[in-house]
Regions:
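Surface-exposed short loop/turn segments
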Residues: 64-69, 76-121, 129-143, 151
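A structural "domain/chain start" motif
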Residues: 14-56, 60, 67, 72, ...
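Compositionally biased, intrinsically disordered linkers/stalks adjacent to structured regions
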Residues: 143-165
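Sec-dependent bacterial lipoprotein signal peptides
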Residues: 1-15
Length: 165
């Protein structure tokens, strides 16, 4: 008798753990695939590696944080969009009218289609930035700043699409 109770409790515990993820992702169980189109860089100022880095990071996030299978097209969840802005602007000026601090901003337009739960679909722009000292040569830190901003953008997109906290 104890054996049957033990098996029942173990089974219930095992199945109840399957409903939750540590990422907080809330994806319908019928959703099995995801397609993420290449995000073209349509910004006025183009950074050549940004499109590929951004697209790869978005794909990696969903591969690592969900059980969805990545497909080239026609996924149950679909992402497409473009990089709409890549900009470096001064944010702090000293008494000699020179910049003390600059800001690198990246803006991305995302179209998300959820074919299983259409009410969760959206079209939205996401914008993130990183500030840096103007005395530092941008070419020495640009890729690191870009990586930092991409991580923030990807987290925002992931949370908006599949996390309902």
């Amino acid at each position: 008798m104890f054996k049957y109770i033990y098996i029942t409790v173990l089974t219930i515990f095992t199945y109840s753990c399957g409903m939750y993820t540590f990422t907080g992702a809330d994806i319908h169980p019928n959703a099995k695939t995801i397609s993420i189109a290449y995000f073209q860089n349509q910004a006025t100022q183009v950074q050549p590696i940004l499109s590929q880095k951004f697209t790869d990071a978005l794909q990696d996030q969903f591969i690592q944080q969900t059980s969805l299978n990545l497909t080239r097209s026609n996924g149950d969840l679909q992402f497409e969009g473009y990089i709409s802005d890549y900009q470096i602007t001064p944010i702090s000026i000293n008494s000699n009218d020179q910049a003390n601090q600059n800001r690198l901003s990246i803006k991305v337009f995302v179209r998300f289609n959820n074919l299983i739960e259409n009410d969760k679909s959206f079209e939205k722009s996401f914008n993130r930035f990183a500030d840096f000292n103007s005395n530092i040569e941008l070419s020495n830190i640009e890729e690191d700043l870009m990586d930092e901003i991409i991580i923030e953008l990807i987290n925002d997109i992931f949370n908006t699409a599949v996390v309902n906290w």
